Amino acid sequence: MQIKHLITLFFLVLIVADQCSAFFSLIPSLVGGLISAFKGRRKREISAQIEQYKDLQKREAELEKLLDRLPMY
């Protein structure tokens, strides 16, 4: 190989290595962000389910009161 090709190859390897190291340094933060987003969404889903359960209990209690008020035929 000529020296010109070796220098070009060397610079190409340096550029690729720099880009890869930047990409690999982003991976832990990306994974952490995905995990925290999933946990946050899961907490929101659980809190929404709790609210739905409370609303269901309120509706059942109101329905029982309404049925108690109806006359028996």
Curated annotation (Swiss-Prot):
One of its GO terms (cellular component) is extracellular region. The keyword Ubl conjugation does not apply. Residues 45-73 form a propeptide. Residues 1-22 form the signal peptide. Keywords: Amidation, Antibiotic, Antimicrobial, Fungicide, Secreted, Signal. One of its GO terms (biological process) is killing of cells of another organism. The modification Lysine amide is found at residue 39. Stable to pH variation. Expressed by the venom gland. The keyword Transmembrane does not apply. It is found in: Secreted. Antimicrobial peptide with activity against Gram-positive bacterial strains (S.aureus (MIC=2-140 uM), methicillin-resistant S.aureus (MRSA) (MIC=8-17 uM), S.epidermidis (MIC=1.17 uM), and the yeasts C.albicans, C.krusei, and C.glabrata (MIC=34-69 uM)). Acts by disrupting the cell membrane (observed on outer layer of the S.aureus). Is not active against Gram-negative bacteria (E.coli, E.Cloacae, P.aeruginosa), and the Gram-positive bacterium E.faecalis. Also shows toxicity against several cell lines, but possess low hemolytic activity at the highest concentration tested. Belongs to the non-disulfide-bridged peptide (NDBP) superfamily. Short antimicrobial peptide (group 4) family. This is Stigmurin. It comes from Tityus stigmurus (Brazilian scorpion).
